[in-house]
Amino acid sequence: MDWLAKYWWILVIVFLVGVLLNVIKDLKRVDHKKFLANKPELPPHRDFNDKWDDDDDWPKKDQPKK
């Protein structure tokens, strides 16, 4: 087990290379042209930030300084 304490980083590199090869292999299977041709429509983005727009913290130019 002394070799494992000395060379643990080689096992990590082998693992990362394996993960990288699997990612590349899976990405080659993706057909981006087919996906873009049949891309589903996204619904409009809804956020509720418009309520915050009424609460303006900036001072108005017409108001005199207090």
Curated annotation (Swiss-Prot):
One of its GO terms (cellular component) is plasma membrane. It is a single-pass membrane protein. InterPro entries: UPF0370. It comes from the Bacteria. Residues 42-51 have a biased composition (Basic and acidic residues). It holds the Pfam family UPF0370. This is UPF0370 protein YpfN. The gene is ypfN.
